[in-house]
């Protein structure tokens, strides 16, 4: 194991149990208005619960999420990199609200960002860059890099900000628990279908054994977009982008934020998204 540490250039391990970190983090996030009420928690009675259910933000199917994305690109002429920048900033902001640097035991707090090969991975790269600006020390693991100018540019931006990239994934959950205070899951998004293949199958297996919190971007990797978890990772923070997906009703973590404040009002009305009122200039809204 000492050879692996030397290879990764990660330095000495910091002692301390995960339990103490959880106690520090509990209640550290500013309390916000709660907009989201999972349908599975609503009783059959009438009254306030029914009003909250009728006013709740809409949960999108995979087909609906793809349709909204296509309209943003085609009808409204947003570019991929434009939405990726806004989404990644939202993710970093939600993380900073849920886990402020002062609530964590290290200075700067160490964060491992694991990026997949698609747009979700691009969101993770942008998120890592903003986390560095917010006072965290991110490290990126990006095993499958698409040969496209957009992603090459995002990698360069992170490198220019002295954000390290790992050559290999730490193989044991305990090692990640000792080296990092948070893991960002930016592996798969809502467009993913089919079986999880290597190296991501092994990565998810390691993540399943972590005790440090996981923050998932849009969809917890390994989850069905509509049905939710089938024994996959259980994030502590979920950042839904544009609008929550149906799988979010199965989320049981402590923090659920909505990010991506870029939906035109006409598009929101067309799909009846019923998005919550973002306060002032905030780019995220706490749903749970």
UniProtKB/Swiss-Prot annotation:
HAMAP family attached to this UniProt entry: NADHX_epimerase
Official protein name in the record: NAD(P)H-hydrate epimerase
Keywords, ordered alphabetically: Isomerase, Lipid transport, Metal-binding, Mitochondrion, NAD, NADP, Nucleotide-binding, Phosphoprotein, Potassium, Secreted, Transit peptide, Transport
Catalytic activity: (6R)-NADHX = (6S)-NADHX; (6R)-NADPHX = (6S)-NADPHX
NCBIfam families: yjeF_nterm
Pfam families xrefs: YjeF_N
UniProt keyword Transcription, yes or no: no
N6-succinyllysine PTM sites in chain numbering: 144
Cofactor note: Binds 1 potassium ion per subunit.
Gene Ontology CC entries for this record: extracellular region; mitochondrion
Residues carrying Phosphoserine: 49
Stated role: Catalyzes the epimerization of the S- and R-forms of NAD(P)HX, a damaged form of NAD(P)H that is a result of enzymatic or heat-dependent hydration. This is a prerequisite for the S-specific NAD(P)H-hydrate dehydratase to allow the repair of both epimers of NAD(P)HX. Accelerates cholesterol efflux from endothelial cells to high-density lipoprotein (HDL) and thereby regulates angiogenesis.
Domain of life: Eukaryota
Biological source species: Bos taurus (Bovine)
